[in-house]
Every structure is written in structure tokens, then in C-alpha cells.
């Protein structure tokens, strides 16, 4: 399939979840939803165990997908996503999940394995690519972005998820049943920073970016 950004993710601490079957069904539904929103080169789908994968045409959309999946599952379940840029070879396009490998796929696998190292225990997204300098810049963004997400409460997580889907602050206030002022306060505490930083890497969706 040529040069892609492959995403390979897994659930954090999945063996300790009380309802693993229910969580797997929820993950599958979230992956279908994000696939519909972002139109990836390869749809997001579960693979084996607690893992899932997909592929995108650019790193910005891949980082957005990782964040959208994470936000849809938090706070009950957390995920880690390894992203790898490079050529992907699909050996059997009829299989589900796709039977594939190649430098891009292995780079994503290496990125996920990096997240399993003790020094990355707090990180949730990592990128490996052919240009070390570019990869370092992407990872600097991802480390800061995911740390900000970790500081958000449940409402902040919902507001950020809605904003990334294109909802304006007025839309969000109506959906949450709270005032515009309360929404604005949440945006000033990190929601807006994450949304705006993400928009620099991936195209904004809807009108949410215009309503500050």
C-alpha cells in the first residue's frame, strides 16, 4: 500500500478489567466510530488479544485518531498507541485483520514496545519514523499533549472529545447542560490548548476551532 503511518494500539492493564468482553465490544464500537470520522487508509479494527490497528495517510491524522480513541474510552479504560511511518506490505487484503508487515508496520510495533518501557510508563502515544529529527518533534508534542489530557477530569475529557469532533463551545454547553462560561473555564484549563495544538498537526473538523 506504499508509504503510510500505521497505528498499533493496546489497552493498558486489560487483564485486570472485570468485564473484558464488554470492554472489547466497546473498543470495537469506538474504532468503527473513529474510522467513520477520519476515513483512514486502513480502517481501525481489533486484531489479537487487546490490540488494534489501522493506517493513515499522514502523521497528523494518525495522532488525532490515537487521541480520539483514548478519549472515547477514558476514564474507565486507557490505551497506548504506537505510530510508525513507512512502507506497508499487505500480503492478504481479504483477511480480517489485514495480514501485513513492512517497515511502517514494524516501526509502529517498535513504537508500541517503546511505550512498554519503564521510562515511558506515563506516555500513551509514541511515533517512529525514518527522520529522527522529525520523529523527535512529533514525540515532544505527543508527550506534552498526553500529559495535559491526563490532568483533565471527566467533564474535561468529554469537552475535548466533542471539540475534536467539531462541536462549538455553544454546542458543548447545550449538550452538557452547563453555561458557556463553565465551558470556557474548562477550555482555559487545558482543553483549548490540546485542541489547538492538535489542529496544528491535523486539519480541524467542523466549526469547533472557531469558537474560542
Spans of model-derived segments:
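Regulatory and interdomain segments flanking nucleotide-handling catalytic cores
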Residues: 1-212
Amino acid at each position: 500500500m506504499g508509504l503510510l503511518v500505521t497505528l498499533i494500539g493496546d489497552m493498558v492493564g486489560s487483564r485486570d478489567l472485570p468485564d473484558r468482553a464488554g470492554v472489547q465490544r466497546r473498543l470495537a464500537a469506538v474504532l468503527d466510530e473513529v474510522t467513520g470520522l477520519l476515513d483512514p487508509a486502513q480502517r481501525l479494527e481489533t486484531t489479537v488479544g487487546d490490540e488494534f490497528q489501522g493506517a493513515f495517510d499522514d502523521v497528523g491524522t494518525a495522532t488525532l485518531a490515537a487521541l480520539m480513541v483514548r478519549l472515547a474510552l477514558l476514564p474507565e479504560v486507557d490505551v497506548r498507541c504506537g505510530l510508525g511511518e513507512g512502507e506497508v506490505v499487505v500480503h492478504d487484503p481479504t483477511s480480517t485483520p489485514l495480514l501485513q508487515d513492512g517497515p511502517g508496520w514494524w516501526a509502529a510495533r517498535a513504537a508500541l514496545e517503546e511505550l512498554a518501557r519503564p521510562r515511558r510508563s506515563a506516555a500513551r502515544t509514541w511515533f517512529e519514523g525514518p527522520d529522527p529529527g522529525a520523529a523527535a518533534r512529533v514525540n515532544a508534542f505527543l508527550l506534552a499533549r498526553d500529559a495535559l489530557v491526563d490532568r483533565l477530569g471527566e467533564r474535561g475529557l468529554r469537552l475535548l472529545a466533542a471539540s475534536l469532533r467539531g462541536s462549538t463551545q455553544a454546542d458543548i454547553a447545550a449538550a452538557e447542560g452547563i453555561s458557556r462560561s463553565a465551558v470556557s473555564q474548562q477550555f482555559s484549563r487545558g482543553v483549548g490548548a490540546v485542541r489547538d495544538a492538535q489542529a496544528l498537526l491535523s486539519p480541524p473538523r467542523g466549526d469547533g476551532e472557531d469558537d474560542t
